[in-house]
Swiss-Prot record:
PROSITE patterns: SHSP. It holds the Pfam family HSP20. InterPro entries: A-crystallin/Hsp20_dom (IPR002068), HSP20-like_chaperone (IPR008978), Small_HSP (IPR031107). It comes from Claviceps purpurea (strain 20.1). Residues 50-83 are annotated as: Disordered. This is SHSP domain-containing protein CPUR_05420. Residues 169-296 form the sHSP domain. It comes from the Eukaryota. Belongs to the small heat shock protein (HSP20) family.
Length: 296
């Protein structure tokens, strides 16, 4: 069995390979894709969403999947057949902009639909994966995925924290880099925001989606970013301009291990020091292990 590459996706093809054996993978071929399509329903997402396995000339980040005949894995389709993972529409088109929700930047809704499918099959979403949207233009596309922003950038990619990012698609928007540190008591989210003032940064928690949202603006010098640039340019020309300024946002999915009761009691805290925003999110105690039940 070939090693699964970047298995932190929520698409059934990848979830199928998590167990590492073809027997487990077999039921998750085309049937799982049809279930996913049925749950997705009418959508503004770009298609086509056709089910195909990996072609022989696959993308570098497309996994090498093998399986028995009829399982939906390892069966080489024609290269003229649309590939849902990378939107290929003709020979050697694996590098087209992704049209499949695995990669499309606007497919958080698709991930939510996939969670419903997973829930209906397994009865829970513990190992369904978290959406990280690595191909979002605001997230830096494939480079962001390769550098860790979506490819394992969070602790315990199966059922644990995994970042998902989305920002305004403007030339002044940027996505701050983050670290997520997991301890028995909390998740420590650390965002790199050099030049940001704490009054210009907003942190919010959505208990319905287990998401922590960080947003705000970083100004160059005076006033807002646009005004600051104009005033600076009046007094001199930029010979080099590399700092990331303007509006930013980052959403971090932390999962159901977060302790909602402690958050409601004011247990979520945030502080900024030396250009780093640090947020402590309480998590449920790790001492709650499996409890044996006596049959009477």
């Amino acid at each position: 069995m070939a090693t699964m590459a970047h298995a932190n996706t929520s698409h059934p093809l990848y979830v199928a390979g998590m167990a590492g054996n073809t027997n487990h993978m077999s039921p998750w071929g085309e049937d799982a894709h049809k279930r996913w399509l049925a749950a997705l329903g009418p959508s503004s997402l770009r298609g086509p969403f056709a089910w195909q396995t990996c072609p022989q000339q696959r993308h570098p980040h497309q996994p090498d999947v093998s399986g028995p005949p009829g399982s939906g894995f390892g069966e080489q389709p024609s290269q003229d057949t649309p590939n849902p993972m990378f939107g290929a529409t003709g020979p050697h088109q694996q590098h087209n902009f992704p049209s499949h929700p695995y990669a499309a930047h606007n497919s958080k809704e698709a991930h939510e639909a996939w969670l419903k499918v997973y829930q209906s099959v397994w009865g829970n979403t513990k190992h369904a994966g978290a959406w990280s949207g690595p191909w979002s233009p605001a997230a830096g596309g494939r480079q962001h995925h390769m550098s860790g922003g979506g490819g394992g950038g969070g602790p315990r990619w199966m059922g644990g924290p995994m970042p998902w990012t989305q920002c305004d698609e403007t030339k002044k928007s940027f996505t701050p880099d983050i670290d997520v540190v997991e301890t028995p008591e909390s998740y420590s989210v650390q965002a790199s925001l050099p030049g940001a003032k704490k009054e210009d940064v907003k942190v919010s928690w959505d208990p319905s989606t287990y998401e922590l949202r960080i947003e705000g603006v970083v100004s160059r010098s005076v006033g807002n970013d646009e005004e600051g640039e104009k005033k600076t340019e009046q007094s001199g020309r930029f010979s080099l301009r590399e700092r990331q300024t303007g509006k930013f946002c980052r959403t971090v999915y932390l999962g159901s291990q977060v302790d909602g009761d402690k958050i409601e009691e004011g247990g979520l805290s945030a502080g900024m020091d030396d250009g780093v925003l640090r947020i402590a999110v309480p998590r449920q105690g790790s001492g709650k292990g499996v409890k044996e039940i006596t049959i009477v």
